[in-house]
Amino acid sequence: MSTIIEKGNILVHRVFDIAGEISLVRAEQLLSADAKGPRLNFPTDTRKAIIIKDSPLKVDLGEEILDLPSGKFPVRIFARIWNYGVISVTLELAIPPGTEWGLLVKTAAGLEVSNEIELLAISRKDVLKKRIMPAVINPAEWEIHEDYITYIIEKADGSENPREFIKKVDVAALILAEDKEHLAADHRNFLVESAIQYSSSDLAIIDWNSALLIEPDGQRDVADVIEFSLTHLLEFRYYDEMLGRKLEELYDAMDQKRESVANIFRNLYADIAEDSSRKYMEFSEFLGRVENSLKTVGDPYLAVAFKASALEFHFDDWRKSISRKMETLAQISQ
């Protein structure tokens, strides 16, 4: 007998880096008629509320109808504006009551390949960016963006016992959006074993591409932590790619040294080194913010959720890669 979902939501994220910084005070003034609700602060009754320093602005971006192979879904769209130059756009879909698990997996597969989501998120981001442009400092949009999907189950057959529930349903098929192939037991067992809980009635499975949350009270604090982590992943990727380009420029300049006039080479070399130093300072500030975030997330459960996200997003690997590149740049620039 198929598992039936009675209540739940799907959050589809697209995260964009549009600038070096965004003045949230100025942006709030520009969007005062549209900004909905308080800054992000993870308020809950049973879990401790936490507040992110320089918490983002939340902006309502209207509604649309999303056409997927599994049906047409009304979509609520909202965005968060982060002071470190990032805009995260979220499409929220309600899971229709009575949805079978297999149909949810089919919906997941449709979401993964939907071009409509991409176009919708980009268009909403562009409109929002235009409206807050006076608040944007050092505008420079990166062509790469992050995507992620969070599935939130509030009520389903057997979900009152989350540990047993995830053994009954094919979690791996949902997380990996695989509606055609039958996945190996290893995939399913690994995901089940990685689950974290605050109480016996809730549960979170956080993977690199999507997450499953069982939240009987409809709480969104873990979902917010995942989105928060996703914005940091984008920043890690940006700095890693940017430093890689700077290294390539330096290596190219070194290769051309014999064919170039010495003072021209020195000027180019100095410019690259100076720019790299500025980026080093930017990244150092960013890294401090990430480390402070880990301390800020003071609730034990949310701290575990944040660390689980950091693990899945390979924060340590990105940090090491960036550190190696910065060390190489420093050595070459001396």
Positions of predicted regions on the chain:
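Generic structural hydrophobic/aromatic packing signal, biased to beta-strands
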Residues: V12-F16, V89-L91, Y151, L203-I205, ...
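Generic alpha-helical propensity signal that fires on short helical segments
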Residues: E28, V105-A109, S229-T231, V261, ...
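N-proximal short alpha-helices
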Residues: K58, G62, D67-P69, N209-L212, ...
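Membrane-associated alpha-helical segments
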Residues: Y238-Q334
